[in-house]
């Protein structure tokens, strides 16, 4: 689903943004991307329940060799899954980044059972016979502790980008016992060291307490892979890293249509 004709943010006057360095000292100025909505009611987002389900699969058998058969397989399966009426943020080709995964699907809804239904439907579909679950994580939007105006990109009107990186994390045991002021300071510095230099990278942080082995699940989106690498790399140089017990596995891939994904897979 890559769209190289998407309108891009305007570069700062007098500055060559044709190749943005990963470790620029200068912070880039915030901007609005024309692809994104600007009329989102943030209070309404915070006052409702919003769930996300990230599901990762591996291909366990080659898809049919005939093109018409593959297209019918994917089309009918996707139609069956769509009856769950959840929002699909994207299908992502994660092949090659890891040896254990080929597909990641990101879905959104205010009802976790509908997200489960979509997952069940895919497993029960014709395409599902070729897929085996590798990893999944459910997340719930909760208002940000220190800034309730900070909304996950996936709920804040931000259009999907061409690349996505998803990973869970667990805080240190002492993190939640630190004074609020100290945690606020640490997180502010963490944000400045990453997103202030990479404002084109959009983040969605959701709570996962009690829904998996993790406390949080994050999704970063950007138009190019190097921007995702850059923001993650930059944020390693912060005090917040001292308060992380786990932040793997990572699943990263390009956004594609179901048909595109199928055309890239091995064939019988």
Each language-model region and where it sits:
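A structural feature that tracks compact, well-ordered secondary-structure segments
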Residues: 57-58, 93-94, 104-110, 119-121, ...
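Glycine-/proline-rich flexible loop or hinge segments
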Residues: 59-63, 99-104
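Short, charge-rich binding segments
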Residues: 96-97, 114, 127-129, 156-158
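Short, glycine- and small/hydrophobic-rich beta-strand elements in well-ordered beta-sheets
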Residues: 78-101, 128-143, 192-217, 231, ...
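Short S/T/G/P-rich N-terminal loop/turn motif that feeds into the first structured element of a domain
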Residues: 2-82, 110-115, 134-196, 209, ...
């Amino acid at each position: 689903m890559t769209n190289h004709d998407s309108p891009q943010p305007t570069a700062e006057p007098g500055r060559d943004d044709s190749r943005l360095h990963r470790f620029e000292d200068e912070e880039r100025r915030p901007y609005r991307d024309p692809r994104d909505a600007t009329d989102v009611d943030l209070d309404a987002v915070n006052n409702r329940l919003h769930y996300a389900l990230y599901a990762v699969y591996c291909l366990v058998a080659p898809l049919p060799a005939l093109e018409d058969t593959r297209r019918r397989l994917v089309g009918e399966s996707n139609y069956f899954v769509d009856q769950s009426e959840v929002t699909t943020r994207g299908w992502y080709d994660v092949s090659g980044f890891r040896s254990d995964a080929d597909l990641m699907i990101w879905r959104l809804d205010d009802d976790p059972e509908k997200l489960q239904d979509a997952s069940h439907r895919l497993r029960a579909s014709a395409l599902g016979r070729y897929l085996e679950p590798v990893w999944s994580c459910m997340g719930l939007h909760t208002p940000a502790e220190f800034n309730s105006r900070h909304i996950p990109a996936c709920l804040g009107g931000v259009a999907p980008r061409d690349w996505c990186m998803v990973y869970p994390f667990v805080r240190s045991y002492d993190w939640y016992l630190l004074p609020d002021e100290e945690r606020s300071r640490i997180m502010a510095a963490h944000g400045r060291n990453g997103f202030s230099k990479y404002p084109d990278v959009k983040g969605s942080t959701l709570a996962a307490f009690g829904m998996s082995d993790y406390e949080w699940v994050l999704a970063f989106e950007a138009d190019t892979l190097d921007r995702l690498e850059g923001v993650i790399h930059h944020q390693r140089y912060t005090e917040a890293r001292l308060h992380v017990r786990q932040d793997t596995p990572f699943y990263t891939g390009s956004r594609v249509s179901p048909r595109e994904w199928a055309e890239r897979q091995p064939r019988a």
